[in-house]
Regions:
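Divalent metal-dependent hydrolysis catalytic cores, especially in the metallo-beta-lactamase
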Residues: 83-136, 152-165, 187-202, 221-226
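Active-site gating loops and adjacent loop-to-helix segments of metal-dependent hydrolytic enzymes
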Residues: 75-78, 82-98, 147-168, 178-181, ...
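His/Asp/Glu-enriched, well-ordered alpha-helical/loop segment
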Residues: 277-357, 361-363, 398
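C-terminal cap of metal-dependent C-N hydrolases
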Residues: 8-10, 19, 28, 353-400
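Active-site core of metal-dependent hydrolases
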Residues: 181-296, 304-305
Length: 473
């Protein structure tokens, strides 16, 4: 299984310029200047992709998705559906990190690990956290440390809720112990050992996180607070934390205007721009979707409108806003969903277009619309709007000739009336005149010699038509 992508503009995420990129099986094996790798000499099975006018980025990493579904806070009817590989990859996501949220009972770690394994077997890359909102943490084994050490897919703990009415209202000691155990599991297994922390609306904001960093030996690298753009106060506190070296995770939105105007969230592109202007390290910011999580929607008057569902589609949408609205360079914007989460979560072989890395790639056009998505070396999505398949061409041609057929049938009937009233000769003579006229029209339209169904009907003198009904000898 080989792919050769030629003459494509590479953002790795740093801008490399025009390159030829060769993948074999699930790895990137060669990146050379455009025109350096010839298609000659490769096996006939090698797929050659013309990258002229297109961009190549790493596959996207969505580091916070409720892959088992979320919600249930308004009752069982509000439980949201599970994520699917197709539903993730069509938005460019080739790597996903699953988590449990408010509900750690109806959904548990056995189901989460099984779902994660399933996504891996289907052809993308998937990891997960152990636990949910609650402390004590509900683990798969009997401890956080053992979960991280012994379960390959588990890379940390989360999403642990603080500063939220739905949290377990953990004490400082309880929260610090969770972070410490998670770090130990990471140290012993060579994983990130990171705690994904859900931040709520409470004005306490990051208080527990800041105390752990200030009062213990645990570094900021072990904690990733998410939903930091929930409100202005939380955003400002999170920016202070990021200026100290902490990593922060923005939650993207599909309906960006709604969440900014009605819910007073900080727009992701504006938040990233403000952090960059303040001097925050661009490598310490990520964007995730909170995918499949339930999103209650309210009007400006506070009226409940319904329950939405988080979608990974927001990742690329937020990147576009960063590039086109706030003029953040593409290499910085795209790093928030590629190299940054890969580095922070220590996902080996992920997040970069680099020799030896996994062949997880996104091909985009100049407007940053997805053209093709490659996961583990396999094409998992093609934008039919940009790449028309052979079947689509045949279908389109069939529809065209069907329409043409109907057009000439109608034209024949109209001509029948015209000829009947202008000529008083016999019926067969009129039919011959119609056929001659129709052939002239067809030739003028450059369809001379093309057999169209309508003309077979014209040759059938037994056909029921207006001319035969009204003609009288």
């Amino acid at each position: 299984m080989m792919k050769l992508i030629q003459n494509i503009d590479v953002y790795a995420p740093q801008h490399l310029g025009k390159k030829d990129v060769l993948t074999i099986n699930d790895k990137i094996v060669k990146i050379k200047d455009a025109g350096s790798i010839s298609a000659e000499g490769f096996l006939s099975e090698t797929e050659i992709i013309n990258g002229e006018g297109l961009l190549l980025t790493p596959g996207f990493i969505d580091s916070h998705v409720h892959v088992l579904g979320g919600g249930g806070e308004g009752g069982f009817a509000n439980r949201t559906p599970e994520a699917t590989m197709e539903g993730l990859t069509k938005f460019g996501v080739t790597t996903v990190v699953g988590c449990l949220g408010t509900d750690g009972i109806g959904r548990d770690m056995c189901a989460l690990v099984a779902k994660t394994k399933g996504l891996n077997e289907q052809g993308m890359s998937a990891y997960c956290y152990t636990g949910s909102y609650q402390i004590p943490v509900r683990t798969l084994t009997d401890s956080i440390v053992k979960d991280i050490m012994m379960i390959q897919e588990i890379i940390g703990t989360g999403e642990i809720a603080i500063s939220d009415h739905r949290s377990s209202q953990p004490t400082f000691e309880e929260f610090a112990r969770v972070v410490a155990d998670t770090r130990l599991g990471g140290v012993l297994s060579g994983k990130a050992g990171i705690v994904n922390v859900h931040l709520g609306d409470s004005p306490r904001c990051l208080d527990l996180i800041e105390r752990v960093v200030d009062e213990t030996e645990i570094p900021t690298s072990q904690i990733l607070p998410t939903h930091i753009n929930r409100n202005e106060l939380l955003f400002c506190k999170s920016m202070e934390y990021a200026l100290k070296g902490g990593a922060v995770d923005f939650t993207g939105n599909e309906d960006i205007d709604y969440w900014e105007t009605i819910c007073d969230e900080v727009r992701v592109c504006n938040g990233i721009k403000r952090m960059l202007d303040a001097g925050v390290n661009p490598n310490r910011m990520t964007i995730s979707s909170d995918g499949q999580g339930s999103l209650p929607m309210y009007s400006s008057d506070g009226e409940f409108l319904g329950m939405g569902v988080g979608q990974s589609s927001c990742l690329l949408k937020e990147v576009k806003e960063c590039v086109f609205k706030t003029e953040i360079p593409l290499e910085i914007a795209i790093s928030t969903i590629t190299s940054n989460p890969a580095d922070i979560l220590r996902l080996k072989g992920k997040g970069k277009v680099e020799e030896g890395y996994d062949a997880d790639l996104c091909i985009l056009d100049q407007e940053l619309q997805l053209v093709e998505v490659i996961a583990k070396g396999n094409t998992v999505y093609k934008n039919k709007g940009n790449l028309m398949s052979e079947a689509s061409v045949i279908q389109l041609a069939g529809a065209f000739f069907t329409t043409l057929n109907l057009f000439f049938r109608a034209l024949y009937d109209i001509m029948g009336f015209v000829v009947f009233y202008r000529h008083k000769n016999g019926y067969k003579e009129n039919v011959l005149l119609i056929n001659q006229t129709a052939k002239k029209i067809l030739k003028a339209l450059s369809f001379d010699g093309v057999e169209v169904e309508a003309f077979r009907h014209m040759a059938d003198l037994k056909r029921l038509d207006p001319m035969k009904i009204f003609y009288k000898k």
